[in-house]
Amino acid sequence: MTYLQESSRPAVTVPKLQAMREAGEKIAMLTSYDASFAALLDRANVDVQLIGDSLGNVLQGQATTLPVTLDDIAYHTACVARAQPRGLVVADLPFGTYGTPADAFASAVKLMRAGAQMVKLEGGEWLAETVRFLVERAVPVCAHVGLTPQSVHAFGGFKVQGKTEAGAAQLLRDARAVEEAGAQLIVLEAVPTLVAAEVTRELSIPTIGIGAGAECSGQVLVLHDMLGVFPGKRPRFVKDFMQGQPSIFAAVEAYVRAVKDGSFPGPEHSF
């Protein structure tokens, strides 16, 4: 069996994401962890496939993402890359693997050798030096600000960020800092819609929202969440796209359409 797909669809590259932002075309991003789903997501025209440390939650059954290792991410990145998706392959740097710029570079090299085309790191102003270090060494970077799940204990739980005037100002400083350091993409998680809209206007790079309203340049969800495969209470920002659909492929197509036409997320999925 082979997972290689014949496709005339042009590959999504880092410059292509920037061009999409400038053209006003929304970016559809989903997490991806194996070759089978990578091939399916690619057929559904998902623009970016993220090998997220969320695999700790949805694959390993962990309560947080903290136990996920670099080897875990590298293994799943290689699985996704073997499907040769046309969408951009982005891999998370797990907790504890980018404490210094040198550590971050060593971790990024391992993931890029496994097939990643960009790495994602959680953090704002304090991370700018590391972002710059990576970009100067030809590592494309996606930053992640707002609710950063690796900081769950520091936050005292999974809480919306940027709700106060001071919090919103800090979030904007964080976003500007990583952009100025060279990040080419930024995820805004669990951020009030108005704050995320302001950040999106202020930056020149694409913003990807998850619980950050419809004004971002694109959206991301955890694959298992949007397919209705989640234990316990569904997060506010998640929509179950499997409802009313005959197949997983149809559900993913519905997600991509909803992101592209701006119907997802709605106010009920935002803060």
UniProtKB/Swiss-Prot annotation:
Query: Which Gene Ontology cellular component annotation is one that this UniProt entry carries?
Result: cytoplasm
Name the reaction it catalyses: 3-methyl-2-oxobutanoate + (6R)-5,10-methylene-5,6,7,8-tetrahydrofolate + H2O = 2-dehydropantoate + (6S)-5,6,7,8-tetrahydrofolate
- Give the main localization category: cytoplasm
Q: Where are the transmembrane segments?
A: none
Q: Which cofactor does it need?
A: Mg(2+)
Q: Does the keyword Zinc-finger apply?
A: no
> Where is Mg(2+) bound in this sequence?
53, 92, 122
What is the free-text note on the cofactor? Binds 1 Mg(2+) ion per subunit.
Location of the active site? 189 (proton acceptor)
Q: Which UniProt keywords apply?
A: Cytoplasm, Magnesium, Metal-binding, Pantothenate biosynthesis, Transferase
According to the UniProt entry, its GO molecular function terms are: 3-methyl-2-oxobutanoate hydroxymethyltransferase activity; magnesium ion binding
EC class name: transferase
Binding positions (3-methyl-2-oxobutanoate): 53-54, 92, 120
Cellular location(s): Cytoplasm
Function (record text): Catalyzes the reversible reaction in which hydroxymethyl group from 5,10-methylenetetrahydrofolate is transferred onto alpha-ketoisovalerate to form ketopantoate.
Record family assignment: Belongs to the PanB family.
UniProt protein name: 3-methyl-2-oxobutanoate hydroxymethyltransferase
* Biological source species: Burkholderia pseudomallei (strain 1710b)
